[in-house]
Amino acid sequence: MEEIDLCWRIQNSKFKIRFNHNSEVFHANAASLKQTNPKKTYLNFRNQLFMVTKNSKNNLFFLLIEKFIIDAIVSIYLLFDKGFNHFIAIIKAYVSFYKHINLLIEFRKKNKRHLKHYQTRSIIFKYLFHKR
């Protein structure tokens, strides 16, 4: 997720993202925390909220409402699939987000978002309702 945030901030600063197809990337996915660790769930949800708030050009209010609804559905799923600790981790992520929201809004105001956003649609709804 950090690499997405970095690319988003680079583009918002009017730089361009390039790639080299000859490069080789070694990525230790979840090297520090295992997928079963609720702390990983907490960090993933919190960092998503921070990233969207800092970088999105869209109307933040409606975007966060949509994200909250999706996250609420996911949290209920995780409650039954992975247990109570993952459910609580998502609640803690939102508490942390609301504690930091003033700083995130300040960051938004200071840093202009210059991206020409394309129309985005939820891949979750696309998967659930269109089976793609």
Question: Predicted regions span which residues?
Answer:
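Acidic donor-binding loop at a coil-to-helix junction in glycosyltransferase catalytic cores
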Residues: 1-5, 40
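Membrane-interface aromatic/basic loop that binds lipid-linked glycans or pyrophosphate carriers
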Residues: 91-132
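Active-site-adjacent helix/loop segment of glycosyltransferases
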Residues: 12-105
